[in-house]
């Protein structure tokens, strides 16, 4: 199962890099696996002075998580490149077209709409205490998880250079 998750993550990161590199003045690079201590992707637009540090998550469940150490990596790179007037931390979430869950000790997959969200997480840099985990749900809501509590975290959508408009999704409560 671990290899499937790793390859799914790599494929998502690779696809994001390709989309960014095909978007005019943007240049993006995948920086390697989690053991590198770097964000998944760094993208720059030198013409407009924009730097994006991107942490990408993909999965077949209803919730995707970004741990604190991965947020810290994005903050370090974002702060290192102060020459860029516009620097953003982007949390990219891709919810696969099939939902995975357990039923009677079996793994079952159910078709659903594939959704992607790009959340601006710049507000995290001003927090005195970083959340242990950032959580994103299938409907695009984000939460900060601290030691003893979960709080709503309204991270705004980021319009990626390859998007025509930000994703606005309405999901009936019965599917959640």
Give the location of each predicted region.
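Acidic-basic catalytic patches of nuclease active cores, encompassing PD-(D/E)XK
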Residues: 1-32, 83
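Surface-exposed cleft-lining segments at the edges of enzyme active sites
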Residues: 2-3, 58-63
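Domain-level recognition of nuclease-like catalytic cores that cleave nucleotide substrates
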Residues: 3-7, 88-176
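Conserved catalytic cores of phosphodiester-cleaving nucleases, focusing on short active-site segments
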Residues: 20, 41-43, 49-60
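Structural signal for conserved beta-strand scaffold positions within catalytic alpha/beta enzyme cores
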Residues: 30, 55, 91-93
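Short polar/acidic secondary-structure junctions
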Residues: 33, 46-47
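Short acidic/glycine-enriched loop/turn segments that link adjacent beta-strands
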Residues: 35-38
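Short, charged, amphipathic alpha-helix that recurs within catalytic cores of restriction-modification
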Residues: 64-91, 98, 103, 113
């Amino acid at each position: 199962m671990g290899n499937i998750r790793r390859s799914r993550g790599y494929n998502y990161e690779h696809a994001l890099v390709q989309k960014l590199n095909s978007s005019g003045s943007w240049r993006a690079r995948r920086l390697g696996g989690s053991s590198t201590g770097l964000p998944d992707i760094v993208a720059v637009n030198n013409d407009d002075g924009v730097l994006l540090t991107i942490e990408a998550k993909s999965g077949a469940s209803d919730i995707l998580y970004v741990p604190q150490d991965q947020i810290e990596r994005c903050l370090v790179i974002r702060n290192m490149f102060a020459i860029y007037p516009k620097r953003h931390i982007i949390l990219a979430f891709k919810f696969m077209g099939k939902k995975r869950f357990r039923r009677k000790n079996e793994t079952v997959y159910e078709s659903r709409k594939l959704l992607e969200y790009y959340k601006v997480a710049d507000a995290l840099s001003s927090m005195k205490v970083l959340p242990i985990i950032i959580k994103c749900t299938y409907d695009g809501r984000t939460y900060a998880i601290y030691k003893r509590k979960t709080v709503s975290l309204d991270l705004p959508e980021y319009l990626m250079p390859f998007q025509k408009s930000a994703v606005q999704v309405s999901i009936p409560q019965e599917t959640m």
